[in-house]
From Swiss-Prot:
It is found in: Cellular thylakoid membrane. Light-harvesting photosynthetic bile pigment-protein from the phycobiliprotein complex (phycobilisome, PBS). Phycocyanin is the major phycobiliprotein in the PBS rod. The gene is cpcA3. Contains one covalently linked bilin chromophore. Coiled coil: none annotated. Pfam families: Phycobilisome. This is C-phycocyanin-3 alpha subunit. The lineage of its organism: Bacteria, Bacillati, Cyanobacteriota, Cyanophyceae, Nostocales. It comes from Microchaete diplosiphon (Fremyella diplosiphon). (2R,3E)-phycocyanobilin binds at residue 84.
Length: 162
């Protein structure tokens, strides 16, 4: 079962053999929050390609060796650059999944679980993705509650990478 604030509230009440009470207020709050989350997911999805491309350029600026080092895991060729943009897009897509479900379940299940092994196997530096996510956070164009929602999932991934 995917972990969300609502599923956790139901599990808690059920384990205590009681009906939902204060959890209903949490549920209503989550429904209000869901509108902002969905707005953020829609906006990030619409801009995903341009955000991933610009975030890759931010990585190249901060870590110029990524474009001068030869090898399949670097951006010294167009194929390498395409892979970098693809990978950043994957991180962004996982952020939108978290926004849609209202919890970190997809991030935990699809990204964080195997992250260390993937980075080690392919010699990928977490600092590249941290830089890309920081760029996306600073430039996604969201404001208000949608920005707060998106930024919380971006920060969650940054913390997991750190």
């Amino acid at each position: 079962m995917t972990k969300t604030p609502l599923t956790e509230a139901v599990v808690s009440a059920d384990s205590q053999g009681r009906f939902l009470s204060t959890e209903l207020q949490v549920a209503f709050g989550r429904f209000r929050q869901a509108g902002s989350s969905l707005e953020a997911a829609k906006a990030l999805s619409k801009k995903a390609s341009s955000l991933a491309e610009a975030a890759a350029n931010a990585v190249y600026q901060k870590f110029p060796y990524t474009t001068t080092t030869s090898g399949p895991n670097y951006a010294s060729t167009q194929t390498g650059k395409d892979k970098c943009v693809r990978d950043i897009g994957y991180y962004l897509r996982i952020v939108t999944y978290g926004l849609v479900v209202g919890g970190t379940g997809p991030i935990d299940d699809y990204l964080i679980g195997g992250l260390a092994e993937i980075n080690r196997t392919f010699e990928l530096s977490p600092s590249w993705y941290i830089e890309a996510l920081k760029y996306i956070k600073a430039n996604h164009g969201l404001s208000g509650d949608p920005a707060v929602e998106a930024n919380s999932y971006i920060d969650y991934i940054i913390n997991a990478l750190s």
